[in-house]
């Protein structure tokens, strides 16, 4: 999942995890501003937490990302990409219900906005295969039969 808005420090240079909230271009973040973090875990459980920008000059975007990772029990990766967008990745395999919403309350009158966080890359369905040890060698077999059931290892 990737945020729709790229934030910068000067209108061109992307923010980093180490960027203080006060340094996000045009955001006007103030100490005491809050960001509501709402999410759905891999298995569909709902989560919610409030992140407070204690000191806009020293609280960083990385602090927010750490709070996101903590809220999901370390089962997600949360980063800033090269364009200054929040990216969250489910670290668990299989079909995922992962969602993340950041609601910037801007109590101090600012306009901080990370945008909506949408699916960027969907995983694919798993293959119905079995791996086993056959005579001390790895054997990988498809569990279905017929010409339509195959796979390639490259």
What residue spans do the PLM features occupy?
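Amphipathic, non-transmembrane alpha-helical segments in extracytoplasmic/periplasmic proteins
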Residues: 1, 59-73, 121-122
